[in-house]
Structure formats: structure tokens, C-alpha cells
Amino acid sequence: EGKRDDGSLLENTCNILKTRGRLSVLANPQQYGADTDEQYFSVALELCITWLNRLLFLKLLEGQLITYHKGDRSHAFLNSSRIDDFDELNELFFEVLAIRVDERSQSVREKFGNIPYLNSSLFEESDLERATIRINELKNRLDLPLSCSTVLKASNGKRLTGSKNTLNYLFEFLDAYDFGAEGSAEIQEQNKSIINASVLGLIFEKINGYRDGSFFTPGFITMYICRETIRRAVLHKFNETCGRSCANLVELHNEIIRQRMPIKEANALVNSLKICDPAVGSGHFLVSALNEIISIKSELGILSDHDGKLLRCDVTIENDELIVTVDDLIFEYQYKDSESQRIQETLFHEKETIIENCLFGVDINPKSVAICRLRLWIELLKNAYYRTTPQPPPYTSEGGGAKNSPPVSGGVGGGRVLETLPNIDINIKCGNSLISRFALAGMPSLPAAGRKKQKELADKYRELVFFYKHAPSNKAEVRKQIENLKHALENFGLPNDKDLKSLWLKKEELSVMALFGFSEKENEKRQKLHEQISDMEQRFAEKEKLVYHNAFEWRFEFPEVLDDAGEFIGFDAVIGNPPYIRQESIKDQKPALQEMFGTFYCGTADIDRKSVV
């Protein structure tokens, strides 16, 4: 254990949590560790990751705004001259970025007038914040000693020494890096190290995986796996749908031209892909999958704007990064240029469509889930653009409208407003992807009335999830409705667990008995059934805590992979990290593996086979 300093963000958070006894308000503190110290540390770490995620995202946003405005530093807002303390940082999170510009208070508009509304749930209070503390509850007066290898330097180039106020230190540390150089080849006035999305991904994976043995997956691995998997999935989708037998993308490209397949129809087929990473971690595979799908569209000659007009640019992947070039030059967004605007809008909405419709992830670690969502938002932020035409009012639960408020005067970019982000968080979920209460198959003998009810619930479920993704003004209420529908669908699930099956059978037996009169003998049987059910419910409740407390129900969680009747149909591709294991470490498990997976078992280490398993 290294030296701990009260001024560090982590220690400051830990101490506030302890002095206020906030573990006692958590429903299940045991999920954060085996003892009190570990629980406080884990809760504090999760809170700090949430806050740092927001700050890193905002630093990238700030870099984008400055780049869009030709280096105009008046668009910088994440510094001590704009943010005095943790109170004002909390105000920035929840009263600025989470509130539409025209709904902000007068004092907030005066102080933060040129900061756009983003709509991201990243700037909504998390469940853990709601239960414990917000960032404004941290102590402002504390200082932190400067690291001996600090990047902060004096005007003479020498490293600074001594200590600084923690928040000021954090702002100056972030400002020592260049967050606005994504894809840019311009010479910087100051020699700053570049922090882009890929570098942040590595940082996230190291922060998040240092305790649980997670490995950083090199870009060439995620690129290769996504390229091989998704290209096969695209070919299969086109061949199956169109009755073709194309062997590669070149043949498919020629077939699209020869058959004069409408551009929008070809795009719709690609957009119907469903890709899942069941151990998503920080989202590296999903980001690579996003890039690969856009690259495939470009290669097939179907990458087009909302009117179906093809883009006049080339899209390739190099070093796990999406590279967009126009006339052999790296594309850079110029919001006053109509063609540049068209390309930027198209790339943003292509990413939005793919993330919303095609990419899904699950992880047992809530910190991983938060980081994965952040990485996908960052990918969208790379192509954020200014809207130049007014939009209708936001969606309402009654339907109608579009997903953004109209621009307000005094917005960013001389009356323009930055396009808001969709609610993509619902595609990345927390849970144990290996444990489920319910089988994927539905009930085998569901009566017609039951099938009709299941279909109605599935239709409503799909509708609400689509509605949620498109920025409703009442997100919390929609989330609640979605959870209620999910629980209603569970009534049509087939239990996996034998104890749960037995409990359901006993309840069904009791309900059948209630249809008839009760003799003394039947009353005794009924009483015995009640006692058995009560005992079984108690035992299963204990099992719920031990085994199923974070179970993930694949049968119901993603309505996008349910058919019209509400039955599970699955994903087109499941991708993920191959297991990094030693043969010796699993020798005791080999007999069980052979019994469970005889089709794949070969007795020797083969990570491809174990990855499939």
C-alpha cells in the first residue's frame, strides 16, 4: 500500500464517507468488499471514477470546441478561473450540462453561457451518488503534494515543486495535455502530449482492472477479431436476405452495384446487425466494432447522408482508429463549410445509429459499465456538430416531436447549438452474464391468450426503449416503465433453476386447487401446500442473495433481440477477449469441462475453443 494523502481525491472521498457513515445506507454493502475498509475504498473508487469520467469527457469536449473555433481559448471552461471549488464543479455537472440552455437559471447562464447542453446520462446523479455523496461534499481547502515526476513546469521549463490545491492541481494537470488533437496534424504552439480516445481507453482499463486481473487488449487484437467476425456476419446477412452467395466484400460490393440495390436498403441491412460483448469491460471491442461497421459501409460504397447521397470521402482503420480522408487529407470539421458539415453530420448519425441498434454489452463490474458507456459517448463526441436549423420540441410520452429543443440565442457558435447525445446507456448493462434465472426458450405450451399478452408487452417494451434512446424529457419515468415491463415479461419466462421450477409448480398446483371446493382432506392438503411454498420461497430467497443477486436475464434485457412474438432470437455475433490462462491453472477443472463441453473439448490449451465456450 503506497503513501495515502488526505488531499487526494480518493482519500478525501473515503474520509467523508466514513465520517458520515454512508455505508449504512447502502442496500448491499457486501458487494463492495469483504470488510468495512475494502467497502469504503471500493465505494470511494467508484465515485471518483464517475467524477473523473465526467471531467475527462468535458476536457475532450473543451478541446473539440476550441478546435472548432480555430484555437479560441474563450471556449475553455475547465479551469480554476471558471470553476472555483467542488461546489461549482457540481453545479457544472448538474445545473449546466444536464439542463437545456433555455431552462438554466439566470445566474448559471451568465457564468456558463457558452457551454452546450449534452443530454448525456453521464451528467445525471448516479444511484451511488444519490445514496452516498456528491462531489460538492468534498473538502475544498486540502492541498496535494506535487509528484516528483509532475508534468507541471515553471516558465523556465523546470518541474514545479511543493503542493497545490487538489482541484487546481487536477485542472492544471489536465491542461498540460492536448485533448483537441484527434486526427489533427497541425503543429501545436506548446509541446503537449496528446490525449485522445485511444489513450484514454488504455488509462481506463488500467484504472479499472488493476485489482481484478483484467488485461489491456491491444488494438491489433480487437481490430482483427472484429474485422473477421463482423465481415462474416455482414456477408451472411446479405446472402441470407437477398439469396446470394458472395464470398467476400468485393463480390458483395459488385453485387450491390449490379443489382442496383437502393443505398438505404443496403444500409438498413447492415444496421440490423446485433453484436454483443458479454464481458464488455471498458468497451474496447465495441469501439473497434463501431469503427469496423463504418469502414465496411465505406468499402461497400453505401456510406451516405440522410438523403441517401454518398459521402465524398474515404474511411479506413489504422492502428484501431477510424481515419476519414477527403482528397487524401485528414478530414477536419469546419462548421461554416457545407460539405464539411454534411460529412460531420453523417458520421455522427452513423455512429449514433450503430451504437443504438447494433452494439450491446454486459459486465459484472459497474465501474466497467460506466467506462464503456463513456467510451461510446466519446466516439460520438468526436463527430459532434453544430445544428444550423431549428428543431421541433423534444419527444413527449404522448408521442410526436423531435429529439432536440430549438436553438436559443446566445448559444455556442454564434447562435448555433451543439447536437445533443442520445441515451445510449441502456445498451450497456450491469450483471453477471453467466447466470440467469430464466431459460432463453419461452414457455413451450403458452395458450393463445398468453402469446397475445407476451406480444403486447414485447411491442410496448421495444417502443419504450426506442423512445428512451431519443432523449425524452422524462427519462427517469421512462426508465421506471421499462423496468416494470421487463418484470411483467418474466411471467412468460421458463425458469432455469430447479428450485424455482419446483416453486412455480407448487404455486400452480395451489391455484388449481382454488378452483374447487375444499373438503377437510383437501383443506389439510392446501395447508400443507402453503407451508411447503412458504418454506421453498424462504430457501429460494437465500439462494437469490447468494447466487442470483446480480444475475443477467438475457431472455428479457434487450428487446432488440426479441422477435415480434416476444421470443428470444439472439445476436448475429458475440465477440470478446480470448481468455489469457495457463494450462496448469485449470487442470482440476478439466473433467468438468469435458463433461459440459464435450463438443469442443480436446484436452490441450486452445484459447479459441475456450473463448467459444
Role assignments for model-derived ranges:
Residues 1-295, 305-309, 333, 358-371, ...:
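Preference for the N-terminal adenyl/adenosyl cofactor-binding alpha/beta module
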Residues 284-346, 436-467, 488, 494-498, ...:
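SAM-dependent methyltransferase catalytic-core segment centered on the flexible catalytic loop
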Residues 346-362, 367, 419-446:
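P-loop NTPase motor core
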